[in-house]
Amino acid sequence: MDLASRYKGVVGMVFGDNQSSNEDSYIQRLLDRISNGTLPDDRRTAIVELQSVVAESNAAQLAFGAAGFPVIVGILKDQRDDLEMVRGALETLLGALTPIDHARAQKTEVQAALMNSDLLSREAENITLLLSLLEEEDFYVRYYTLQILTALLMNSQNRLQEAILTTPRGITRLMDMLMDREVIRNEALLLLTHLTREAEEIQKIVVFEGAFEKIFSIIKEEGGSDGDVVVQDCLELLNNLLRSSSSNQILLRETMGFEPIISILKLRGITYKFTQQKTVNLLSALETINMLIMGRADTEPGKDSNKLANRTVLVQKKLLDYLLMLGVESQWAPVAVRCMTFKCIGDLIDGHPKNRDILASKVLGEDRQVEPALNSILRIILQTSSIQEFVAADYVFKTFCEKNTEGQTMLASTLIPQPHPTSRDHLEDDVHMSFGSMLLRGLCSGEADGDLETCCRAASILSHVVKDNLRCKEKALKIVLESPMPSMGTPEPLFQRIVRYLAVASSMKSKEKSSTLGKSYIQQIILKLLVTWTVDCPTAVQCFLDSRHHLTFLLELVTDPAATVCIRGLASILLGECVIYNKSIENGKDAFSVVDAVGQKMGLTSYFSKFEEMQNSFIFSPSKKPPQGYKPLTRTPTPSEAEINEVDEVDEMVKGNEDHPMLLSLFDASFIGLVKSLEGNIRERIVDVYSRPKSEVAVVPADLEQKSGENEKDYINRLKAFIEKQCSEIQNLLARNAALAEDVASSGRNEQSQGSEQRASTVMDKVQMESIRRELQETSQRLETVKAEKAKIESEASSNKNMAAKLEFDLKSLSDAYNSLEQANYHLEQEVKSLKGGESPMQFPDIEAIKEEVRKEAQKESEDELNDLLVCLGQEESKVEKLSAKLIELGVDVDKLLEDIGDESEAQAESEED
Amino acid sequence: MSYAYLFKYIIIGDTGVGKSCLLLQFTDKRFQPVHDLTIGVEFGARMITIDNKPIKLQIWDTAGQESFRSITRSYYRGAAGALLVYDITRRETFNHLASWLEDARQHANANMTIMLIGNKCDLAHRRAVSTEEGEQFAKEHGLIFMEASAKTAQNVEEAFIKTAATIYKKIQDGVFDVSNESYGIKVGYGGIPGPSGGRDGSTSQGGGCCG
Ligand SMILES: Nc1nc2c(ncn2[C@@H]2O[C@H](COP(=O)(O)OP(=O)(O)O)[C@@H](O)[C@H]2O)c(=O)[nH]1
Ligand SMILES: [Mg+2]
């Protein structure tokens, strides 16, 4: 932004103003006294006066601006020895750059401080000058200089970052300030925090200059998480350095290690009191941990190794223990801290099988009161009064179960119904309760007191346990629960019990409809479980359809105007799963019957429209923001406030929507992906089923003929019966056709008001017509291909015949050749035999003679060589003998020496082989 | 993680001479023929042993382009060692050595140890700078010299270790005040806190606390 031109305009305006012009001439006079005065004392008084005037009013700051800077900079440059003048100059400068509070009242007024910052930072030289002042002895000089730099940074960040970067040793000087007296150190900390915001190169240089060591030593000095706001500043600086730089993350890991940051999370003894500052400090440290867990903000594909290495090292350094202590065992930690802790635990094990196993093996508590950490987390989920905490802890199970068949199986293996508790013992009292028992207890807690909240949280966990795991699904399907009142009713499968709770929840909801009492997520979460469970699982479909009421209820739910978009959508998906995963052939329970029921209840158009409505809702829309965005903590927030803010923000986004905002986090990307893919499959399959009604009457042309021996009457009766059956089928089809026509007509009626439905219906028609046309086309194509195939096979057969003849011929000539070869071989063998036997020695005289000659020659040659070698060896041996004698004279253990030499040469030979 | 000394290195030289490859070969023992241009500065670290003492090397790999010079200069002063690299197959990278050296002399501390590396010596058939010329340049400017290949790993270990050994020797000879971290040296556990500290038995303030 170019403020200079505006500045001129404003100055002009100010000059036009009488009062200001007075001020201006006053300042002019002061500046004159400062630069041209001869009496040192007078100059000092003048600068003190100037300083107080400038600090007071916006107008004075404006008037000071362009004229004042050269004078002040001159003092700083050339009169360093006059400490008082330098101090005064710096204070004046600071005054000119600090916005005056009551100036805000007059909104039209130009912010003089802003313009002055702009003027001053325009010259990089000025910044260099200021940085050089940091080396002055005087405390105040350094202190004011830091404040001036901070003020400039706040107003013209980029320019200052650049200027400091290009000043040789500029950053070094600032870093040195961290080792200065406390007041200066704190000031420097703030400055560096601003300086490192979104400036990667500065971040790296700051780290190069040893920032990590300095930061952690300050944190330690200040008492870790118990320290004051300085600790928070330190952590903010640290987070700036680590947020987007994998290079800096590696450096921390490879040099200081992660212990210093992890140890900030360590609670000393039992902590009862979490002050606001301590909470903020812990949250900041958890943010650091989270950055390390997530690697760089924008994950490049190749740089995944950094992220994984971070996760491994963090767990090696016992981070999990501290997190569990903070999030699970410490009952006094504020909810915000506990939530952040769960998020970190979840991310730490996400896609990291080893860390997952370590978490699974962790136990908490002491002596006999130990229990697996996962059980403790489950208990928190079931019992916490905070929805945020439930969602955060739920995330741990989500990441634990994802692509972890073994872990899911381990959790599911304990899903064994306990005999009904006689006295209602409390969950918290029994650390010996298995994971599965606790989960089942949670699931059934609706039975006793209609506590569907706990039930739905348990349902959420169960959906992680069965997700994508057919064995766990089957296992859970086999669970049969006793009837709450044994006298009434029979035992009930878990799956059906959960469907029943869904029904209870929806009836409760419709009763409470008039009350504006908050949004609920109970039905959605239970539906999520049922949808997840039923995927790829015909047994679940069967179990669902075992009771005719279920289908009726689900159809009601899909069309229930009181239900939310999301509930209706998920119910439709569940309904669709009853079609696509239906393996039943039983009348009334097969895929066709379900489709039929849908068609009769609401019509396919209206059914499909539920999907679209849901996909358009905020939870499914792709524009939904990732739930984990970077949000800096302000310097003095109250944690509870921060939480409220967060919820508010989400609320803002979903205004006018009936679904609970927490579903944003609970419906993770993989679930949303699942729903989308299911939707596609369902549409396809339903059209398929609908367009091919199974025929009740098999038409076999031969049946229509009079059978031999059949008399006319019987024949006619048979035909009559046949025609009756066909007639009823035609009636049936006509009725269906009418329903479909009505569906089309009614969607046509809604055409004007509801474009989307109309579109859906024409899409439907098109799809059906398309499928018929396709079938026709396919059949004729098939005919063509069959014909072509026949021709091909025929020609193939004839060519094969030819081939066979040829092969036969070949075989014959081959066998002839073989025979003659064998004959030749036989002759040769005979010859060899006779040669060996010496029966005909003169048959090949030349060869024998030559062979003999060559043999002799070779023998002679090798003999010669051997002789040479022997001579050499003899020489060597005598040498060794001589040397040995000499060495013995000198007192050396010759045998040992010779042995060593042997070993060495062996070793050498070996290594040469490598 | 504990070390007797920590040395900071920088790697400088024209773009494309193989600085990043040398660092990768040294820290990860691998060669990556195609990789991104270094933007600004990248970091690597490794532990070595000299005189039976564990020594941690922190290495900053800089970008060679002119536009990054002002940034990379910030790293000179705090470095104990510099690897100045040229490419034996590209004459101009050798010709630029003087300007790099000038930069280093101007911004680095006077005791910085500089190792001149003629890289890509595996490409002997494309050689454009003879070994003797490299030697001669090093001799004239008081540098240590080696030809190396980041591709075959030839002399890569040696170059980094020889530099460290030289720095180590300088410490033993009392050239540095090692309590002053601006020389790019830090004393950890088991390191001698410099000759002066050794004599009067006090340990230096700067080192050892955070190993
Ligand atoms: N043959 C060969 N190629 C190398 C060697 N070192 C680096 N290179 C190649 O030279 C190019 C530049 O390397 P790089 O490390 O990015 O250079 P930098 O700009 O100095 O960091 C890359 O294509 C490398 O594959 C080496 O020792 N031998
Ligand atoms: Mg590079």
UniProtKB/Swiss-Prot annotation, chain A:
Source species, domain of life: Eukaryota
Which Gene3D superfamilies does UniProt cross-reference here? Leucine-rich Repeat Variant
State where the protein is found.
Golgi apparatus; Golgi apparatus, Golgi stack
Q: Which GO terms describe its biological process?
A: post-embryonic development; protein exit from endoplasmic reticulum; vesicle fusion with Golgi apparatus
Q: What's in the keyword line of the UniProt record?
A: Coiled coil, Golgi apparatus, Phosphoprotein, Protein transport, Transport
- Which Pfam families does this UniProt record tie to the protein? Uso1_p115_C, Uso1_p115_head
Q: What happens when the gene is disrupted?
A: Dwarf plants and accumulation of the precursors of the two major storage proteins albumin 2S and globulin 12S in dry seeds.
Q: What is its main location?
A: Golgi
Phosphoserine occurs at which residues? 911
Q: Give coiled-coil spans as residue ranges.
A: 723-837, 863-901
Disulfide bond keyword on record: no
| InterPro entries hit by this protein | ARM-like, ARM-type_fold, Uso1_p115_C, Vesicle_P115, Vesicle_Uso1_P115_head
- List the record's Gene Ontology CC terms alphabetically: cytosol; Golgi apparatus; Golgi membrane; Golgi stack
Domain comment quoted from the record: The C-terminal domain (689-914) is necessary and sufficient for Golgi targeting.
Q: What does this protein do?
A: Golgi matrix protein playing a role in tethering of vesicles to Golgi membranes and in maintaining the overall structure of the Golgi apparatus. Functions in the anterograde transport of storage protein precursors from the endoplasmic reticulum (ER) to the Golgi complex.
Name of the featured protein:
Golgin candidate 6
The encoding gene is GC6
Swiss-Prot record, chain B:
Motif Effector region mapped to chain: 35-43
SUPFAM superfamilies on file? P-loop containing nucleoside triphosphate hydrolases
Q: According to its record, what are the GO cellular component terms?
A: plant-type vacuole; plasma membrane
Q: Name one GO biological process term.
A: endoplasmic reticulum to Golgi vesicle-mediated transport
> Could you tell me the membrane topology recorded for this protein?
Lipid-anchor
Q: What SMART domains does the database record attribute to this sequence?
A: RAB, RAN, RAS, RHO
Q: Can you provide one Gene Ontology molecular function annotated for this UniProt record?
A: GTP binding
Protein name per the record: Ras-related protein RABB1c
Q: Which UniProt keywords apply?
A: Acetylation, Cell membrane, GTP-binding, Lipoprotein, Membrane, Nucleotide-binding, Prenylation, Protein transport, Transport
From which source organism is this entry? Answer: Arabidopsis thaliana
Which NCBIfam families does the UniProt entry name for this protein? Answer: small_GTP
Task: Report residues binding GTP.
Answer: 13-21, 61-65, 119-122, 149-151
The record's listing under PANTHER family reads: DRAB11-RELATED (PTHR47979)
Its annotated compartments are: Cell membrane
